[in-house]
Regions:
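Walker A/P-loop phosphate-binding motif and the immediately C-terminal alpha-helix
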Residues: 3-41
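Cytosolic-facing regulatory segments adjacent to core modules
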Residues: 81-136
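C-terminal boundary of histidine-terminating zinc-finger modules
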Residues: 230-241
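Residue-level preference for the first positions of well-ordered beta-strands
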Residues: 4, 33-35, 99-101, 133-135, ...
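Short, hinge-like loop/turn segments at secondary-structure boundaries
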Residues: 51-55, 176-177, 204-208, 233-235
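Conserved catalytic-core segment of NTP-binding enzymes
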Residues: 115-217, 226
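N-terminal phosphate/diphosphate-binding loop that engages ATP/GTP or pyrophosphate donors
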Residues: 28-97
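C-terminal alpha-helix
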Residues: 246-256
Length: 256
């Protein structure tokens, strides 16, 4: 069975960037194929990886829901909605050389995400035996944790920036996992965008207050910002990038 790694944290702390670089590290070190899952309704892991999915699970939901009502969405005659869904799910996985990407995406209007969340859960369970590693970029906050979407995760990586709010958000996610009796083999914190790669006393104190294990820090790097501004996939950062080097050391520590 594949090892499930869940990456979570407050919005805006760079968790998706680190998630993409983690996928890259695993692929470059012979841990492929990796199944990358963008479980954030505000999907952008594909941009970090430089991949364009054919269809997201959210779009697939809309296609199924509106079939027979909206002329743009038609299910072939003689096929049930469930059978059509199963047939189309393979189109929701973008295949690359060393990894595949599945994107949750958003639904239109006021539609509930329960169906799409359920698809994420069932697909991860179904595909787990086909990949040595499954890396899930979770929605900002605690949505998938609270709904039990990923009870099978083995490693929970919490990401924060240097702010107290970011660390506190990571602490709340860790506490919620404990309350829901989720028992990853490893749970720890990565602090991202750290000036000069050194944490100040206030941030270290907050990490201790939250009872979090610090896996490591990733330094601030203007090159990441520039790549983002230029629309370049972050995984194209040079190998000697401080961000890639720091994350690589953290992954080695995790024994992945």
């Amino acid at each position: 069975m594949g090892h499930v790694i869940a990456v979570s944290g407050k919005g805006g702390v760079g968790k998706t960037t680190l998630c993409g670089l983690l996928i890259q590290y695993l692929c470059e070190n012979g841990k492929h194929p990796v199944l990358a899952v963008d479980a954030d309704a505000n999907a952008n892991l594909n941009e970090v990886l430089g991949v364009k999915p054919e269809i997201t699970l959210g779009e697939l939901r809309e296609e199924i829901e509106r079939a027979g009502v909206d002329p743009r969405y038609q299910i072939p005659t003689g096929i049930t909605k469930q059978a059509y869904l199963e047939m189309r799910l393979s189109d929701a996985i973008a295949e690359e050389d060393d990894y595949d990407l599945m994107v949750m995406g958003r639904t239109q209007g006021q539609g509930c995400y329960c169906f799409v969340n359920g698809l994420v859960q069932t697909q991860v369970q179904k595909l787990q035996s086909h990949y040595p590693y499954i890396v899930v970029d979770n929605e900002a906050g605690m949505e998938h944790i609270s709904r039990g979407i990923l009870p099978m995760m083995e490693v929970a990586i919490l990401v924060s920036d240097c702010s107290r709010r970011g660390v506190q958000a990571a602490g709340r996610i860790a506490k919620l996992m404990n309350e829901l009796n989720f028992k990853p083999q490893k749970t720890g914190l990565i602090v991202n965008r750290v000036p000069d790669g050194k944490l100040d006393a206030g941030t270290l104190e907050e990490i201790r207050n939250q009872g979090l294990e610090l896996l490591g820090v990733v330094p601030h790097d203007d090159q990441v910002y520039q790549y983002d501004c230029d629309g370049k996939p972050i995984i194209r950062l040079p190998k000697d990038s401080p961000v890639r080097s720091a994350l690589g050391e953290i992954v080695k520590k995790l024994g992945l």
